[in-house]
Amino acid sequence: RQTDAFTPGGVMGKRPDYAVTVYCNLIRRSFRDVPIIIGGIEASLRRLAHYDYWSDKLKRSILLDSQADLLLYGMGERSIVEVADALNDGMDVHDITYIDGTVFRVKAPDENLSYLRLPDYQSLLENPKKYAESFYLQYQNTDPFSAKRLLEPYGVQEFVVQNPPQKPLSQQEMDHVYGLPYCRTYHPSYEKLGGVPAISEVRFSLASNRGCFGACSFCALTFHQGRIIQTRSHESILDEAEKMTHEPDFKGYIHDVGGPTANFRQPACKKQLTKGACQNRQCLFPTPCKNMIADHSDYVALLRKLR
């Protein structure tokens, strides 16, 4: 690429490859004893051993290469508050091993806890089938109602532990999160550098849901947000849309309403709300489940209200 849409002015070369790892190592060099907690899409999708396209190699958990102390995967609203409360109470970051939606490293697993043991990292390097087996086990444990605690060995004295994911947010919680007073733009200091081009795609868009029960093999959304759909209320979305119209750069139209799975406005079936997603089959493959609720009326009603 000749430009970088996420950099001021679209200039290439300002952001390093493996940004989380680079920045964390620089922080660790300057602030040796400060807790480093990572999250976001890069950390989430590299939380355990993973294939890296840039280097064409299997890489270790980003938690090890970045030298971070704790990793929060998924959307993280609940887990980040729990971690902040624990640190505020004086707890050492290395003792924060009990929060759902987190990944941490240890020299030896706790014998009082149960784990689902993944193939060790060395076996992944030696046998591609072991890597497929490992990812399948990870994929089978993305549901907060049934997921087990995962243990990934790196030799005999280093282990990465993934706690089960956080429970989905309720609609009230979703409304609260998206109702916070966000600035909806980049930092003003970037303006003189040409602004950040990527903001144009999202500044006047509305997120209405998260999660996906589609399970497409080319997509990582389920691995990041889970299979259970979570939605905002119509009132929350309409309120944000109204505020958007007062933005000085608003052109009179909304770019997008929804997200990758915009037409999913409810869990695939009623069972998912109390028991989670099925472990023995997918919602849509090889044929749609008979219990799946296929109804777009709520989304259509939302779009009509926004119009």
Residue ranges and their predicted role:
Residues 225-253:
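Conserved alpha-helical substructure of the radical SAM core
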Residues 1, 45-47, 77-85, 106-109, ...:
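Flexible glycine/acidic-rich beta-alpha junction loops that bind and position SAM and/or redox cofactors
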Residues 20-28, 84, 174, 241, ...:
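Generic structural signal for well-ordered alpha-helices
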Residues 129, 133-205:
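N-terminal [4Fe-4S]-dependent radical SAM core
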Residues 193-220, 253:
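N-terminal pre-triad scaffold of radical SAM enzymes
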Residues 34, 243-307:
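Conserved SAM/AdoMet-binding glycine-rich loop
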Residues 69, 177, 212, 216, ...:
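Conserved, mostly hydrophobic/aromatic
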Residues 1-155:
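Glycine-rich beta-alpha loop elements in corrinoid/cobalamin-binding modules
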